[in-house]
């Protein structure tokens, strides 16, 4: 058993300083029954906690670190740029360079606006969609997280296409009533919502691969159907690619699945581990954003040199071959975990999209939030604790996916599979 004494002491202090001792709720490790593990450093695919324990990391700061920790080229570029100034509140050439890479690689993006987080990106995209269409309502999908903007913190009602109720205190009902929540991968529900409210629906916002109910890819025809119905009713289609952007494919999920939205939200990978977000799309729509148009959005640190540098240096190193390697390694990890679980009769379903993997403790196919919730959460928590003791750092939530980086070696994958087999044996012992 590993010692976490220093992490425990650090957490005892942290709870006196921050709500719940953390700056983002899932980091509290509540769903897995552990004290949060405090990290000290990372290198490549490995991270090290303040007690000196080493882990193979499949969290990667919740996705951004596609090159692994402390990539030498990213670090060197950040040092060079930081010495020249960390922020100016004025344009820099670095913004141009990252914007050009994004526009070159994301099929639907003709113009892009940089912001500071994924939440800013989705909030801004929704404001733009409402301003452009002059409509109020949006459709989102049950179990999909698009940041903590008021319009998006909504849970589904009990019926199909039910108007949302606030999912957090502090979200006014007057805001929630404009959000329609339907099941993911359920095109009929979307069509029904449009039949009822179509003239007032500004946009559908969707993760092309759902990443906050585990990893749930779209069923065949789902994204294409969303594209068709939004065009039919004059609404915008927004892809939230904060998680999938440059993770699923060189051209993002929209390139992989061959469906182009009107607006795209990005984050995570395009900041290389620094705070960043972006939203972009067709020029006709994006030109409505101030100062070109009347839809206002601004940010003190938007496009800051450090985030632009980390993002540029990260994207510059990614090639189409990178994603072939990701698919090979992810397929091997999926296969190995499946074989280990089968051997010990562990109920499981594994979903995969690019370098994202979702492991669910259920035999039911996981295609939406309801089926994701059939996973055995107690078994997941036990699995999580045992894997941590084996030196595998996983997301401390059943409803988050695993991420691979270019730094993960074949040896890392094989060790992870062997560790899972040992854990499954103990869980069934």
UniProtKB/Swiss-Prot annotation:
<comment type="similarity">
    <text>Belongs to the class-III pyridoxal-phosphate-dependent aminotransferase family. HemL subfamily.</text>
</comment>
<dbReference type="InterPro" id="IPR005814">
    <property type="entry name" value="Aminotrans_3"/>
</dbReference>
<keyword id="KW-0627">Porphyrin biosynthesis</keyword>
<keyword id="KW-0963">Cytoplasm</keyword>
<comment type="subunit">
    <text>Homodimer.</text>
</comment>
<dbReference type="Pfam" id="PF00202">
    <property type="entry name" value="Aminotran_3"/>
</dbReference>
<dbReference type="InterPro" id="IPR004639">
    <property type="entry name" value="4pyrrol_synth_GluAld_NH2Trfase"/>
</dbReference>
<dbReference type="InterPro" id="IPR049704">
    <property type="entry name" value="Aminotrans_3_PPA_site"/>
</dbReference>
<dbReference type="GO" id="GO:0005737">
    <property type="term" value="C:cytoplasm"/>
</dbReference>
<dbReference type="GO" id="GO:0042286">
    <property type="term" value="F:glutamate-1-semialdehyde 2,1-aminomutase activity"/>
</dbReference>
<dbReference type="GO" id="GO:0030170">
    <property type="term" value="F:pyridoxal phosphate binding"/>
</dbReference>
<dbReference type="GO" id="GO:0008483">
    <property type="term" value="F:transaminase activity"/>
</dbReference>
<dbReference type="GO" id="GO:0006782">
    <property type="term" value="P:protoporphyrinogen IX biosynthetic process"/>
</dbReference>
<protein>
    <recommendedName>
        <fullName>Glutamate-1-semialdehyde 2,1-aminomutase 2</fullName>
        <ecNumber>5.4.3.8</ecNumber>
    </recommendedName>
</protein>
<keyword id="KW-0663">Pyridoxal phosphate</keyword>
<comment type="pathway">
    <text>Porphyrin-containing compound metabolism; protoporphyrin-IX biosynthesis; 5-aminolevulinate from L-glutamyl-tRNA(Glu): step 2/2.</text>
</comment>
<dbReference type="InterPro" id="IPR015424">
    <property type="entry name" value="PyrdxlP-dep_Trfase"/>
</dbReference>
<dbReference type="InterPro" id="IPR015421">
    <property type="entry name" value="PyrdxlP-dep_Trfase_major"/>
</dbReference>
<feature type="modified residue" description="N6-(pyridoxal phosphate)lysine">
    <location>
        <position position="268"/>
    </location>
</feature>
<dbReference type="InterPro" id="IPR015422">
    <property type="entry name" value="PyrdxlP-dep_Trfase_small"/>
</dbReference>
<keyword id="KW-0413">Isomerase</keyword>
């Amino acid at each position: 058993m590993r010692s976490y004494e220093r992490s425990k002491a650090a957490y005892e202090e942290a709870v006196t300083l921050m709500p719940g001792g953390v700056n983002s709720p899932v980091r509290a490790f509540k769903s897995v029954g552990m004290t949060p593990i405090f990290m000290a450093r990372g290198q490549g695919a490995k991270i090290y906690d303040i007690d000196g324990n080493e882990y193979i990391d499949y969290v990667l700061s919740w996705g951004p670190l596609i090159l692994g920790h402390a990539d030498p080229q990213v670090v060197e570029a950040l040092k060079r740029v930081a010495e020249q100034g960390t922020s100016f509140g004025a344009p820099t050439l670095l913004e141009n360079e990252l914007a050009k890479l994004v526009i070159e690689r994301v099929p639907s993006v003709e113009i892009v606006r940089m912001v500071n987080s994924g939440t800013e990106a989705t909030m801004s995209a929704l404001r733009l969609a409402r301003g452009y269409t002059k409509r109020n309502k949006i459709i989102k999908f049950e179990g999909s997280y698009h940041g903590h903007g008021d319009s998006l913190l909504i849970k589904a009602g009990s019926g199909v296409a039910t108007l949302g109720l606030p999912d957090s205190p502090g979200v006014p009902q007057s805001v929630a009533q404009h959000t329609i929540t339907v099941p993911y991968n359920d095109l009929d529900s979307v069509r029904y919502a449009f039949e009822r409210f179509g003239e007032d629906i500004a946009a559908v916002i969707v993760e092309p691969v759902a990443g906050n109910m585990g990893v749930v890819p779209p069923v065949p025809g789902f994204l294409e159907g969303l594209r068709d119905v939004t065009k039919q009713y004059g609404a915008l289609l927004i892809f939230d690619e904060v998680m999938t952007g440059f993770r699923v494919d060189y051209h993002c999920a929209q390139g992989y699945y061959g469906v182009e939205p009107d607006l795209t939200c990005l984050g995570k990978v395009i900041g290389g581990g620094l705070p960043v977000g972006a939203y972009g799309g067709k020029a006709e729509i994006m030109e409505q954003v101030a100062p070109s148009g009347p839809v206002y959005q601004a940010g003190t640190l938007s496009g800051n040199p450090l985030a632009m540098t980390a993002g540029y240096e990260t994207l510059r190193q990614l090639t189409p071959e990178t994603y072939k390697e990701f698919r090979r390694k992810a397929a091997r990890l999926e296969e190995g975990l499946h074989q280990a679980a089968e051997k010990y009769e562990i109920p499981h379903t594994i979903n995969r999209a690019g370098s994202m993997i979702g492991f669910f403790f259920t035999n039911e196919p996981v295609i939406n939030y309801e089926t994701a919730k059939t996973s055995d959460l107690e078994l997941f928590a036990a699995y999580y604790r045992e894997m941590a003791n084996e030196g595998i750092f996983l997301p401390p939530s059943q409803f988050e996916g695993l991420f691979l980086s270019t730094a993960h070696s074949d040896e890392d994958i094989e060790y992870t599979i062997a560790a899972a087999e040992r854990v499954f044996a103990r869980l069934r012992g």
